[in-house]
Amino acid sequence: GVGFPEKGTPQGGIISPLLSNIVLNELDWWVVSQWEEMPTRKNYVHRIYANDTPDKSCTIWVLRNKTNLKECYVVRYADDFKIFCKKRSDAVKMFEATKKWLMDRLNLQVSPEKSKIVNLKRHYSEFLGFKMKVRKKGKCKNGNPKYVIKACVKDKALIKIRKKAKDLIGSLRQTYDKHMEYRLIQKYNAYLIGVHNYYCIATYVNLDF
């Protein structure tokens, strides 16, 4: 028979990302309000860029040096999100506060298996098919170490990509029909171009393949 679920959305359904954005848009603004958009007594924005984006460098300096606020930034795609903090103690507080806010405000629970605090100086964190950590690269003007992102294709995604490419090559080798061969070559090239376009932003993608 045909079943009609009363809760949740189908895995991979096109409506799922849309609903996630509608519901979790409030989470984005809540995290931003804890740091980037925290109201200040004085307006520290002195210029507006050509694309109408305000220069918040002075505001950020004041928040970092004149307050006890926990610096944090959120990056989200659908229901998958990361919150970045400068210190582990801040990350622990933000982690607990976010779980509580999601439950109290949206009646949502985070996945215990997928949710954890990661030290990006020591370990990778995975997000949208990438794995990332930070590494030292020179020093800042004040003498403190400067860190840059190291992004690679995550291990599971790399295995899946290689298997798919191998299967496509296998199909190509087994055909002797010229028209089918042409279509398989097009399919193989389209797949590789798609993979390249998606992962080209990774800093170490040339070492992954």
Predicted regions, residues:
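Non-catalytic terminal/accessory segments
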Residues: 1-209
